[in-house]
Swiss-Prot record:
HAMAP family registered for this protein in UniProt: Glu_tRNA_synth_type1
GO molecular function: ATP binding; glutamate-tRNA ligase activity; tRNA binding; zinc ion binding
Name of encoding gene: gltX
Motif ('HIGH' region): 15-25
Protein keywords: Aminoacyl-tRNA synthetase, ATP-binding, Cytoplasm, Ligase, Nucleotide-binding, Protein biosynthesis
Name of the protein in its database record: Glutamate--tRNA ligase
Binding site residues for ATP: 243
Pfam families, sorted: Anticodon_2, tRNA-synt_1c
CDD domains in alphabetical order: GluRS_core
Task performed by this protein: Catalyzes the attachment of glutamate to tRNA(Glu) in a two-step reaction: glutamate is first activated by ATP to form Glu-AMP and then transferred to the acceptor end of tRNA(Glu).
Amino acid sequence: MSNPTPTGVVTRFAPSPTGFLHIGGARTALFNWLYARHTGGKFLIRVEDTDRERSTEAAVAAIFEGLDWLGLKSDDEVIFQHTRAPRHVEVVHELLAKGRAYRCWMSIEELEVAREKARAEGRAIRSPWRDAPEGDLSAPHVIRFKGPLDGETLVNDLVKGPVTFKNIELDDLVLLRADGAPTYNLAVVVDDHDMGVTHVIRGDDHLNNAARQTLIYQAMDWAVPAFAHIPLIHGPDGAKLSKRHGAQAVGEFADLGYIPEGMRNYLARLGWGHGDDEVFTDEQAISWFDVADVVKAPARLDWAKLNHINAQHLRKADDARLTALALAAAETRGEPLPADAAERIARTVPEVKEGAKTILELVDHCAFALKTRPLALEEKTQKQLTEETVERLKRLRDQLAAAPDFDAATLETVLKSFAESEGVGFGKFGPALRGVLTGGAQAPDLNKTMAALSRDEAIGRLDDALAPRA
């Protein structure tokens, strides 16, 4: 199913399509992707949709939308697990032929009694059909794995270290249900083997499954992949991540204005790091990442750190791309925008992106440029427009109109020269000028504000405010 890679390393991300792509799942996908890239291997995606009742097309779409946004794409055809049911059944029959599986006709009532007895004796459940002659094949029954009754199963986990499980405590898990449907632990082993997966990197809530899956590998005489069980992500308070901690789905982080490269950087830092390096590129992460360096303790979601990291990547991002993202975000707010909103944002982004942590903040910083004339002036600004200040701003208006260029550097020179020629400090006209140009909205330094507005818009706003009032 999977072509050999130069190093032979194959990782996979195997989500269940029962909901959105959780931030924890996204980090698991990223770690698999990083390790595959680091080793020159392959990163594969398999949708574990054997639970047909809970799996939905909407969830599949949401998962891939999140992965696409993060830039994590499979290096091969995406596998949908339910389509491989015949292969899963084939392996179960091989296990039956090897004497490593058996048919079980236990009723629900018998199963409950057996559970209570096993619990009292401190062992896993064992079916009376384990070594009994087969019953009526036409009667409903399941097929169970026939695990060893003594000894231990060792899982050499790349993150947790060696973990041993007493076989007496591992139950004879069901491989095929009474309706013929394969179970999770069986399907995972068969698919990972057939896909050539060499490294199973997943959340540590799957650690107990590793022992059961190891026994199935061994029963089939298949090579056991390397396991790496990474810690879960907790909220800032150390509790399990939940809705009360804010966003959980990757799509929610996108809606909040985070950008993919910032999110990848932050997710990589959740449980892994490279010295004191906090902000880094994908290329650096690929070069440095090793799953063996992932820490054992749960990682905590830190909004301040996420904002800091995202801000660094936002500043380095292409202005045209940021303009498109900011315009799209502004349009979703439902507020009327000027016809030339794209051009206004394009002029403003270079002047304000240094102070923004997210795309939503970038839109806020562009708000002054998106106002339409005439601007409604704040009461504070109206009071600042004394007769003396109005006359001074009229003189400044003429100098601005005559400026050879209307870029931030030129405008800084014009403002300084004007203050000197007037013999006053900037405070004598700057606050009123800012109010006239922005309508009280947040804005950068005045030279940058005017450059973002353009000569025509800045002069027009000045003319509106300085015109004689009725």
